[in-house]
């Protein structure tokens, strides 16, 4: 189901100057111990030979690295879809296959612009439509449609066109220099943080925090898919802009909104897009329960 009549496929990476000149739509920012000294009246206890002094002092809680569900640098594949589009189920099934791969971070963004034709998609959010339109502007064709897949923020294809998408994934691995990200959790405070490495970036990158559910099934009662049971994989339930990375090594505290938690997500991901909606140069996915 197309919103425009033109389709341009293939990997496209804009020059840094082009990214810097882009003015895409912008989503609103969502937001020990020491041993005691012995008394002068009592001799200090002797430490047995087999015991080190460090063993007598309780260790401070150590930050725990959260194990990522994907490889350090997965290729991000974003499907823009709708329960109101009868062309989307094959693309959803394909995304389910991609979601099983360790070298890919597959996400399903449900858009809202087909809600008017008979069925309101309960996973749709205007923010996801904004993201798709911004990608269209960055890629240069201004076109949005469903099912549309964006690979690594650098190329688009019809979501059910497996050959084109597979080729774009392979190209992304060779043409984009992906950065490894690390998520850590402080057991004492419960704070979740993102460790950003030093990287040579042509322009600053926007950091997006995404939550998603692994699998959903819904009975569609009206619209183009009336009478069908549709399955969606890695269904995005929230999208937050959490910071900007200028290439310097740093640590960023991650705070998830109460609304995002209320959606009972299964997984979380951090995606770094150059200049808001340019190529994805870093990503990491992790289990929601390990962090929050």
What is each model feature region?
Residues 1-23:
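Sec-dependent N-terminal signal peptides
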Residues 21-143:
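Active-site-proximal cofactor/substrate-binding loop regions of enzyme domains
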Residues 122-127, 131-142, 159-292:
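Short, conserved sequence motifs used for protein processing/export or organelle targeting and
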Residues 149:
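Ligand-binding face of N-terminal immunoglobulin V-set domains in extracellular IgSF glycoproteins
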Residues 152-153:
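Short strand-turn-strand beta-turns centered on an Asx-Gly dipeptide
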């Amino acid at each position: 189901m197309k919103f425009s009549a033109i389709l341009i496929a293939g990997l496209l990476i804009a020059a840094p100057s082009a990214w810097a000149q882009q003015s895409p739509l912008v989503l609103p920012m969502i937001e020990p111990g020491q041993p005691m000294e012995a008394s002068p009246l009592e001799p200090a206890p002797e430490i047995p030979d087999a015991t080190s002094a460090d063993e007598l002092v309780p260790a401070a809680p150590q930050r725990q690295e959260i194990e990522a569900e994907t490889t350090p640098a997965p290729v991000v594949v974003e499907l823009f879809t709708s329960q109101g589009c009868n062309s989307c189920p094959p693309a959803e099934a394909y995304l389910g296959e991609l979601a099983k791969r360790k070298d890919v971070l597959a996400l399903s963004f449900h858009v809202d612009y087909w809600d008017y034709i008979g069925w309101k998609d309960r996973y749709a959010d205007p923010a996801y439509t904004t993201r798709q339109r911004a990608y269209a502007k960055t890629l240069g064709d201004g076109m949005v449609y469903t099912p549309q897949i964006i690979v690594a923020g650098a190329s688009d294809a019809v979501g059910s066109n497996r050959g084109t998408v597979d080729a774009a994934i392979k190209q992304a691995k060779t043409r984009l220099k992906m950065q490894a990200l690390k998520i850590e959790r402080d057991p004492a405070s419960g704070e979740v943080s993102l460790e950003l490495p030093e990287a040579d970036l042509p322009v600053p990158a926007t950091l997006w925090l995404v939550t998603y559910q692994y699998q959903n099934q819904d009975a569609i009662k009206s619209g183009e898919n009336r009478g069908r049971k549709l399955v969606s994989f890695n269904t995005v339930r929230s999208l937050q802009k959490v910071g900007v990375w200028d290439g310097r090594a740093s640590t960023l505290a991650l705070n998830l909104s109460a609304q995002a938690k209320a959606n009972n997500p299964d997984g979380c991901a951090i995606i770094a897009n150059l200049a808001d909606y340019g190529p994805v140069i870093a990503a990491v996915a992790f289990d929601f329960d390990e962090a929050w």
